[in-house]
Regions:
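Hydrophobic-ligand binding "helix-grip"
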Residues: 39-42, 59-105, 115
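Generic structural detector for well-ordered beta-strands
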Residues: 10-14, 50, 65, 99
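Hydrophobic pocket/interface hotspot
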Residues: 20-21, 30, 49-51, 66, ...
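Hydrophobic ligand-binding cavity/cleft-lining segments
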Residues: 1-38, 45
């Protein structure tokens, strides 16, 4: 895994840390901003994660594990994408980190970071879609 290649995006959200946390861990809300993805996990350290769905006609079944949890602050997990064209070996897993930082009452900074890209081209492709996804996360959390 090449941890040097990272994609990251931050946004200020007018919501509580709890609301943003719920947006990031609630399967029904994840489905809204993650292209209809079904998410199955209990978000406990060491637990498996399964992301599955259909993206532009391609069925996917991605798998990973929860690595770190600090409720309402930090969530870190790894996953392998069945659409990556690689074997499901740990060295082909991505690492995703969500950080929620309270800026003031009712305002937080949310950061999404993904690392482990095999090429700069794949990193840029992911980064190009992050802005839209982050805006959707903000919209959901502010409801």
């Amino acid at each position: 895994m090449n941890t040097a290649l990272k994609a990251s995006q931050s946004i200020e959200i007018n919501a509580t840390c709890e609301s943003v946390w719920d947006t990031m861990t609630n399967p029904e809300k994840i489905k809204v901003y993650l292209y209809g993805t079904e998410t199955n996990t209990d978000w406990k350290v060491g637990s498996p994660i399964v992301f599955q769905g259909n993206y532009e006609g391609h069925v996917y079944n991605d798998k990973g594990n929860v690595l770190e949890v600090k409720e309402n602050e930090l969530l870190k997990y790894n996953y392998w994408s069945s659409m990556s064209g690689t074997e499901g070996k740990i060295e082909n897993y991505f690492i995703v980190t969500y950080r929620i930082e309270q800026l003031s009452e009712g305002k937080v900074k949310f950061t999404w970071q993904q690392e482990g890209f095999p090429t700069e081209e794949k990193r840029k492709h992911t980064e190009s879609g992050l802005c839209t996804m982050i805006e959707q996360i903000k919209e959901i959390a502010e409801r």
